[in-house]
Amino acid sequence: MSESVHTNTSLWSKGMKAVIVAQFLSAFGDNALLFATLALLKAQFYPEWSQPILQMVFVGAYILFAPFVGQVADSFAKGRVMMFANGLKLLGAASICFGINPFLGYTLVGVGAAAYSPAKYGILGELTTGSKLVKANGLMEASTIAAILLGSVAGGVLADWHVLVALAACALAYGGAVVANIYIPKLAAARPGQSWNLINMTRSFLNACTSLWRNGETRFSLVGTSLFWGAGVTLRFLLVLWVPVALGITDNATPTYLNAMVAIGIVVGAGAAAKLVTLETMSRCMPAGILIGVVVLIFSLQHELLPAYALLMLIGVMGGFFVVPLNALLQERGKKSVGAGNAIAVQNLGENSAMLLMLGIYSLAVMVGIPVVPIGIGFGALFALAITALWIWQRRH
């Protein structure tokens, strides 16, 4: 890849537009497919405890392929890696449409998502640089948030109309992402000719994990972000069961509206953190993390829709204020120790492992018959205690 290609590309070049459109459609499909498939499980009378299993097979793919996907992204043109990954997502969504086991289809989507993640972030640095790179990351995050909001709501609303229509819309979104990927210029591979010895690749990845874990600051960041995203995905599934019990509403759309309030709140909280927190004042974000658990506890006791909306937006605000500085800390310290790509891969492993653990505990609680409101209360209390313990540990070290 020539220097001119790397540095002189406009922020709104054809390639950058293609990346942003592909990211929006791919993330739209991910979020719509989750709620469409949950509606399918409900329509086919799967047990309630099976709902979080759906997300567990998705994140399981992330964990299984974590040591390898970074090298895949660096060994081939990233635009083509993204196209292949979206093709896997399309295949998974289409298989669910055609009646293949939804857990198998969703696993395929998870494999595609695992391959897609390092490529979508890595390609930004190949299409632009400097101050434009910061803006490009902002565009990527903005398109992702928009896709989360619109995709979640679309999945629930379309599923209330017809589950098959919702699933078909997800497949179309992935198909559109594949088409958008075609318009990304075929840049040279970042690190071609690497060894594909799986043992060596795994050993290298584990060395990066060990290096980050031994550093107090990066360990603190990894634990904090993992707790947050593990709790966030568990809250998504908690809402699906909580809404009919606490609010008496049985449609598929209402949980998606409530999830959208969390996403909006995260945007607000992230903006506040950017203005009020620096790497030197990291401790300012910790009270917000504790308050997430407290507000989840209060939210679980609600029986009216408007207070539920307000409290979930507040949870999102606290979440954005908490997690954005932790991400920045890991990126800054990780870049200097193991490289940004390895740091992101290790972070993905930590976050998805936390999701797997928390979803497993939640699924077990539902399976043994614990009512959803006490689950929510316990969930909020435990999260607040966990972040408090993390803060105490950070202050001592």
UniProtKB/Swiss-Prot annotation:
The keyword Metal-binding does not apply. GO terms for cellular component: plasma membrane. It is found in: Cell inner membrane. Keywords: Cell inner membrane, Cell membrane, Lipid transport, Membrane, Transmembrane, Transmembrane helix, Transport. It is a multi-pass membrane protein. It comes from the Bacteria. Residues 1-17, 74-90, 166, 248-256, 302-304, 365-366 are periplasmic. Pfam families: MFS_1. The chain crosses the membrane at residues 18-38, 53-73, 91-111, 145-165, 167-187, 227-247, 257-277, 281-301, 305-325, 344-364, 367-387. SUPFAM superfamilies: MFS general substrate transporter. Residues 39-52, 112-144, 188-226, 278-280, 326-343, 388-397 are cytoplasmic. Catalyzes the facilitated diffusion of 2-acyl-glycero-3-phosphoethanolamine (2-acyl-GPE) into the cell. This is Lysophospholipid transporter LplT. It comes from Shigella sonnei (strain Ss046).
